[in-house]
């Protein structure tokens, strides 16, 4: 064992790391040890020693390095380092010195000490001075702290003597022997880094650039003379504090680096500036210099920016001329100055600079910043920014003649105002020129598709003679000349629009009429398909005798006189768009599809005589009005979110819509009534195909929604969905003997078309998927449960289904008539649908106006249909079709005459806030308040009674009744139904509804075994599948139960007693034996969760029905759940 004692003096430790390494290597040359261990020791000493005082009076520091014979080093240097760190912290805090090893932390504490008024040593007098009062550390506090530290260190040293070896894989530099020591070391490092980050954040942004230049100069040029080491992470604030204190000349006791790092002199005591010296790097602290220093050629750091009250004279070799903080007067201009004038403190405008004799230099980047100038600067010829903000309101001089490759000469519109017109501008027509007609354009060319470019969002450009936008909005007030006869291949000649610029004009352009002409009616023409232009959004159109949309919303409550018979050549008398609406007149029923213009405008193409109609894909918002077609195709789009398309054909027996994104709608016009299929266009594209004469309809795969409606139904089922969360599918068939609905997630709807009235199936799309199967003549029908919606199905009413929903989230209302063979009420989100039967098949479909306000009018027997206006009503007319406005729906109607055969719905739509008052002849017998109480028993069921069960309560189901068709509420859906009649050929749905995860096993006598749930119970059904299977598999366990009760019980009882006597935990075997019975309890719990609310009802049915073997098995599993004491009583008996 070789021990080497190295004596390290403060002067020796004040050297840098290289010198320390060399001297230590010279001292240990005689010792034969590996160099790596010695290098670790030297690095430890160099990293952890403190330069400065003599460690509180201790002149010597002994470091013992022990080398064993196996060349493994045992170092006790960390104990010495702990002593040194604590003592230096104590005594340096008293002397005004910082005990941190990091320069950033020392600088930060130096600033803090200066604020607190700690004493420091003056640079000239070498005496301790105090600028102002502050907290001071006394000697008594230091002694007390020192004694405490010594006691603590002795305990640690005594503890460390036990462990004398260090693992060879541990690092010596900063490594601790235990996890606790390592954690303490890491915490200290983290605190040091936090102090550095906090200090860096204190630097103001205005001083960062100049101070960074000081760092570079001090580190690169003045490293040796100043004694500052080259540290790249040295920030500007630390260097600034060092530069503010000039170090004294080096002595034997104190080194240059020691004096420069100690920060002995505060800047308050310097009343006069020091004379400049050539070898002084830190010239003058910035706090107390009242007069500027004379310039020096070799001085890099001229003047700090705080207290210079007068500007310094310019110099050619000065990099940072003048900081911007304290200049009360502007500096004279300088040709070679990089930063001409800072913008902070200029109270007066700068004088105009003369034209430079020399060309501008590349280093003259920042001429004058414009933030702090109170007056504008004079113009200059060599200014890069030609037009300041004030010049934007004045017209520009005319530009050069246009070139062939110049598409758009005028840049983007200015937010303040339009640019002046120019001759060579492509976008020629500003908003002012739209009020006057344009001169006739050149003869059209064959390749001219679209003459009007996309609208500008901010404002129009000035007009020009050769503008591509030939027809402004004012030209719509005059009729267009007749176009050439249509050709076979001329369906829609307009390709996709350009988003940025217009297409060249042509004579055979399809877009003949822009949107501004819609405000007034066009003169009638023989070949004109559209007699009346679209409605104005702001105000109603003037009344006309031949107008189809005659009655505003106020006149709907009074019957209108019969209108004139339709004529053969009258196709569309009044197309109305609010913001988009199209109404066909010659169709026996009309689909009015207006949409919300802001969020999701939609497209509609209505063709009459075309045998094949194909909807093109459009992007942005064009409006194409084809005049060669006998009907009009209006195609407006929403450019931001998703364009939409609709194709409505009249004479096509079979229409197939191609792939549309995000929406497609194809409606075949052989249907006596129209199915309105609106969708939510934001998230997912939707597709719908409705066919009438196809005997077998198969829906392909649609994502996210699919809908196939077979048109053998005398009435139409409207199946709208909420497309946000989940895709949906619907298959509705009436006369098809085998129709199977594929897998649906999260909603499924199967409607059997034996009902002479329409089944309305609304869903709540946000929270839970829902499923509903409604059948009339099927002997076993199960009604689904809805949350948070409610469905009221009146039985004694002549088929009126009132479907109100949760008003907060999705306020919807639906009234469905029974005796209308061809009226379909669609369900919208969050919308309201009212289908009136008293009108000759007019369906008024208003919706929620905030999110997606839409309107649909479906007519059956009316040759002309009128759509409602959202903004304002149209003037009344004699032949108006719309009888009931939306305002009168909120008040109760007077009692009507006794019901007649053609009277479908006598009660207007329900109020969103509350129900209507009851009346004797009211079809909706049960208002929303009556839903919480059971209904009185009704008359015996009749053959024409469709749905006998009223709507479920939001909180719970209504009590059952004998004459109720929907026998099983949502809770009873999990129990088997009584055996139904043998299946017939006309039975539509033979397979029970699919479950969300997987279908239940089929049963021969069960039509709808397990209808799916729509609420939170749907999630509970997921584990029910394996549970039911396990219950079926565990059917043999009841036999061993019987054996245990009769045979093995006497033998098991003494076994239990012995286990209780021998084992300390006697209840444990008892629990285990109870757990033996648990396999039967588990299915009991599962089935009990399924039938919890309606446990007595399935018992009654099970007792009376006595179904096949499968059902009693299920009964046993279900009977044991609520009646656990019953098997116990049997065992006791």
Swiss-Prot record:
Keywords for this protein: Membrane, Transmembrane, Transmembrane helix
Localization, UniProt: Membrane
Biased composition (Pro residues): 349-359
Composition bias, Basic and acidic residues: 406-416, 448-458, 490-500, 528-538, 903-913, 945-955, 987-997
One GO cellular component, as annotated: membrane
Presence of keyword GTP-binding: no
Composition bias, Polar residues: 252-262
Membrane in keyword set: yes
Principal cellular location given in the protein's record: membrane
Pfam families per the UniProt record, alphabetical: NPB13-l_MII_rpt (PF20885), NPIP (PF06409)
Topology term for the membrane: Single-pass membrane protein
Disordered: region residues: 241-262, 290-575, 868-1133
UniProt cross-references to InterPro entries, sorted A to Z: NPB13-like_MII_rpt, NPIP, NPIP_N
Residue stretches spanning the membrane: 60-84
Annotated family: Belongs to the NPIP family.
The name this protein goes by in its record: Nuclear pore complex-interacting protein family member B5
Gene: NPIPB5
């Amino acid at each position: 064992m070789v021990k080497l004692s190295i004596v390290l003096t403060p002067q020796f430790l004040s050297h840098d790391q290289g010198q320390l390494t060399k001297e230590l290597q010279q001292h240990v040359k005689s010792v034969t040890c590996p160099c790596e261990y010695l290098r670790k020791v030297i690095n430890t000493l160099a990293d952890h020693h403190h330069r400065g005082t003599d460690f509180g009076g201790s002149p010597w520091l002994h470091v013992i390095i022990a080398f064993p014979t196996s060349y493994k080093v045992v170092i006790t240097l960390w104990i010495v380092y702990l002593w040194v760190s604590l003592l230096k912290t104590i005594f340096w805090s008293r002397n005004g010195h910082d005990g941190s090893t990091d320069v950033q932390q020392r600088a930060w504490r130096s600033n803090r000490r200066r604020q607190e008024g700690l004493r420091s040593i003056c640079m000239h007098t070498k005496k301790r001075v105090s600028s102002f009062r502050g907290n001071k550390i006394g000697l008594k506090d230091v002694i007390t702290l020192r004694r405490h530290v010594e006691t603590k260190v002795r305990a640690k040293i005594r503890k460390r003597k036990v462990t004398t070896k260090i693992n060879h894989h541990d690092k010596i530099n900063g490594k601790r022997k235990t996890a606790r020591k390592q954690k303490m070391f890491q915490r200290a490092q983290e605190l040091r880094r936090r102090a550095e980050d906090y200090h860096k954040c204190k630097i103001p942004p205005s001083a960062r650039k100049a101070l960074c230049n000081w760092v570079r100069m001090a580190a690169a040029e003045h490293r040796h003379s100043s004694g500052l080491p080259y540290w790249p992470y040295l920030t500007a604030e630390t260097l600034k504090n060092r530069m503010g204190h000039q170090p004294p000349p080096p002595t034997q006791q104190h080194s240059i680096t020691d004096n420069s790092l100690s920060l002995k002199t505060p800047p308050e005591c310097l009343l006069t500036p020091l004379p400049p010296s050539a070898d002084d790097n830190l010239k003058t602290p910035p706090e107390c210099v009242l007069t500027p220093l004379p310039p020096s050629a070799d001085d890099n750091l001229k003047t700090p920016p705080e207290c210079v009250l007068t500007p310094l004279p310019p110099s050619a070799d000065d990099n940072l001329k003048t900081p911007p903080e304290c200049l009360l007067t502007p500096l004279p201009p300088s040709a070679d100055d990089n930063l001409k004038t800072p913008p902070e403190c200029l109270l007066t405008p700068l004088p105009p600079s003369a034209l430079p004799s020399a060309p501008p230099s590349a280093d003259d980047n920042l001429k004058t910043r414009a933030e702090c100038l109170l007056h504008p600067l004079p113009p200059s010829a060599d200014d890069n920014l030609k037009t300041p903000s004030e010049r934007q309101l004045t017209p520009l001089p005319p530009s050069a003649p246009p070139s062939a490759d110049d598409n758009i000469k005028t840049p983007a519109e200015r937010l303040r105002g339009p640019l002046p017109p120019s001759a060579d501008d492509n976008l020629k027509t500003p908003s002012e020129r739209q009020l006057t007609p344009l001169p006739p354009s050149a003869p059209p060319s064959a390749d001219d598709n679209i003459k009007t470019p996309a609208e500008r969002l901010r404002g129009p450009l000035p007009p020009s003679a050769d503008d591509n936008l030939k027809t402004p909005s004012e030209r719509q007030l005059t009729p267009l000349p007749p176009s050439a006869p249509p050709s076979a291949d001329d369906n829609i000649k307009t390709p996709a629009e350009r988003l940025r610029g217009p297409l060249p004009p042509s004579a055979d352009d399809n877009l003949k009429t822009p949107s501004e002409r819609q405000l007034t009616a066009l003169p009638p023409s023989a070949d004109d398909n559209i007699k009346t232009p679209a409605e104005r959004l702001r105000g109603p159109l003037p009344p006309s005798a031949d107008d189809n949309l005659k009655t505003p919303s106020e006149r709907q409550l009074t019957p209108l006189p019969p209108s004139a018979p339709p004529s053969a050549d009258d196709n569309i008398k009044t197309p109305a768009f609010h913001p988009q609406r199209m109404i066909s007149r010659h169709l026996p029923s009309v689909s009015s599809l207006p949409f919300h213009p802001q969020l999701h405008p939609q497209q509609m193409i209505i063709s009459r005589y075309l045998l094949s109609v194909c909807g093109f894909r459009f992007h942005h918002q064009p409006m194409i009005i084809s005049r060669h077609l006998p009907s009009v195709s209006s195609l407006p789009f929403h450019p931001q979110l998703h364009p939409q398309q609709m194709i409505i054909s009249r004479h096509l027996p079979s229409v197939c819509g191609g792939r549309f994104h995000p929406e497609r709608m194809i409606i075949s016009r052989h249907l006596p009534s129209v199915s309105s299929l609106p969708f939510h266009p934001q998230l997912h594209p939707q597709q719908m195909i409705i066919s009438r004469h196809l005997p077998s309809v198969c829906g392909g795969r649609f994502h996210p929604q699919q809908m196939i409606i077979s048109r053998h139904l005398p009435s139409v089922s409207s199946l709208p969905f909420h497309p946000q969360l989940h895709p949906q599918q619907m298959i509705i068939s009436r006369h098809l003997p085998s129709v199977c609905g594929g897998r649906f997630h999260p909603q499924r709807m199967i409607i059997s078309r034996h009902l002479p009235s329409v089944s309305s199936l609304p869903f709540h799309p946000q929270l839970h998927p829902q499923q509903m199967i409604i059948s009339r003549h099927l002997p076993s029908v199960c009604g689904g449960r809805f949350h948070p919606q409610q469905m009221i199905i009146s039985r004694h009413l002549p088929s009126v289904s009132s479907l109100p929903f949760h008003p907060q989230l999705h306020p919807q209302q639906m009234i469905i008539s029974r005796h209308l063979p061809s009226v379909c009420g669609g369900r919208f989100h969050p919308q309201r649908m009212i289908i009136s039967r008293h009108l000759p098949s007019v369906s008024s479909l208003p919706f929620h106006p905030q999110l997606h306000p839409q309107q649909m009018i479906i007519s059956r027997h009316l040759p002309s249909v009128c759509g409602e206006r959202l903004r304002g009503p149209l003037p009344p007319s004699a032949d108006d079709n719309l009888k009931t406005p939306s305002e009168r729906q909120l008040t109760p109607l007077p009692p009507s005459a006794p019901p007649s055969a053609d009277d479908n719905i006598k009660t207007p739509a329900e109020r969103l806030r509350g129900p209507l008052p009851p009346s004797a002849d009211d079809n909706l017998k049960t208002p929303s308040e009556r839903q919480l109480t059971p209904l009185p028993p009704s008359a015996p069921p009749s053959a024409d009674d469709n749905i006998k069960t009223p709507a479920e309560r939001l909180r719970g189901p209504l009590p059952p009744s004998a004459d109720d068709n929907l026998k099983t509420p949502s809770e009873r859906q999990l129990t088997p139904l009584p055996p139904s009649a043998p299946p017939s050929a006309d039975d539509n749905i033979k397979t029970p509804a699919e479950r969300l995860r997987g279908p239940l096993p089929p049963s021969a006598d069960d039509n709808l075994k397990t209808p799916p749930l729509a609420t939170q119970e749907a999630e509970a059904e997921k584990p029910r599948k394996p549970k039911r299977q396990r219950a079926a598999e565990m059917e043999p366990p009841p036999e061993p139960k019987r054996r245990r009760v009769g045979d093995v019980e006497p033998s098991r009882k003494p076994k239990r007693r012995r286990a209780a006597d021998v084992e300390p935990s006697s209840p444990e075997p008892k629990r285990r034996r109870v757990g033996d019975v648990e396999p039967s309890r588990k299915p009991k719990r599962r089935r009990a969760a399924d039938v919890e609310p309606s446990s007595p009802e399935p018992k009654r049915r099970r007792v009376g029905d006595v179904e096949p073997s499968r059902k009693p098995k299920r009964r046993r599993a279900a009977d044991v759940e609520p009646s656990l004491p019953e098997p116990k009583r049997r065992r006791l008996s």
